[in-house]
A protein has these predicted regions:
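Active-site/binding-pocket entry motifs
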Residues: 1-9, 102, 121
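Short, surface-exposed, polar/charged, turn-prone segments marking secondary-structure boundaries
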Residues: 1-2, 55-56, 74-75, 92-95, ...
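Nucleotide-sugar-dependent glycosyltransferase catalytic core
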Residues: 59, 66, 70-92
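A short, mixed-charge helix-start or loop-turn motif at secondary-structure junctions
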Residues: 12-15, 75, 79, 101
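Short linear elements at protein peripheries
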Residues: 3-26, 127-142
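A short, conserved alpha-helix in the catalytic core of glycosyltransferases
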Residues: 12-15, 20-71
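Non-catalytic, C-terminal membrane-associated alpha-helical segments of glycosyltransferases
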Residues: 83-98, 103-142
Length: 142
């Protein structure tokens, strides 16, 4: 996930900036606010629970900021296999859209995720990539 010494695959601002959400691995929140929000959504196991918490905070008038000067290191360098991550991201995104967005937005998210999975299953067959084939075949069933 890291490129070079400190450049993330996803864009990271160079200055303090208001953002939609931050990774749970680097999330700092006051205990009172966390309690007011009733913690993480127990339906979302991993990978989207941080985004969902920040979204609920925003709906209550609280903002999320990214501080690039703060460096945190994840001791174990990961939370599971790539397949585990992909499947839980799919589940989490769909739960987020079902809970917070309109039915049309949920269906659009579902269509986009299924389309991506179908394309990657086909690609996995074409290039004989067992990981793509197995992972995204499972994702199609979500």
């Amino acid at each position: 996930m890291l490129i070079g010494s400190n450049k993330l695959l996803r864009e990271s601002p160079d200055e303090i900036k208001r953002v939609d959400w931050v990774s749970g691995a680097s999330l700092m929140i006051k205990k009172t606010l966390f309690q007011k929000l009733e913690g993480f959504d127990k339906e979302i196991f991993m990978y989207v629970e941080d985004m969902e918490l920040c979204y609920r905070a925003l709906k209550k008038g609280f903002f999320t900021y990214f501080y690039p000067q703060i460096m945190l290191f994840h001791k174990e360098l990961g939370s599971g296999s790539r397949t585990f991550a992909i499947l839980n991201i799919y589940k989490g995104v769909l739960l987020f859209f079902r809970k917070h967005k309109s039915k049309l937005e949920y269906l659009l998210a579902l269509l986009l995720l299924k389309t991506k999975a179908a394309v990657l299953v086909v690609l996995g067959k074409i290039i004989n990539n067992k990981y793509l084939l197995e992972t995204y075949s499972q994702a199609l069933k979500i």
